[in-house]
């Protein structure tokens, strides 16, 4: 895909305090995660709730592969990016299991922790996921 990113002018921590030496960064990533069903037979989706380790997309043991933009700093002009999926440590892909794909594009990389710079702007275009 292609992206451009402008961080907001003032970074705040999760206590709404200014962090003067910190500049916001964006985050673009995708994860492949194993299906887990609730009592009604529906997949339990991963979320941004970092307080629930198993439901949180960043820590869930169900995530087996991840692809991510390496540098989330300011990019003024449209820039092409690619990211390859890599198996996480001690994980394997089992073709007999069902998996789900989640794609996250965030203007504040730590926004799920309620930290970032208001006004940060991430624009993504022509995002594609391809398989081999």
Language model features by range: what are they?
Residues 27-30, 54, 60-62, 124:
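Hydrophobic core segments within long, regular secondary-structure runs in both alpha-
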Residues 33-36, 89, 99-102, 110:
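Short, well-structured beta-strand
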Residues 23-27, 96-101:
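Outer-membrane beta-barrel architecture
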Residues 2-38:
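Extracellular-facing segments of soluble proteins and assemblies that are Gly/Ser/Thr-biased and enriched
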Residues 75-77, 93-98, 108-131:
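Extracellular carbohydrate recognition
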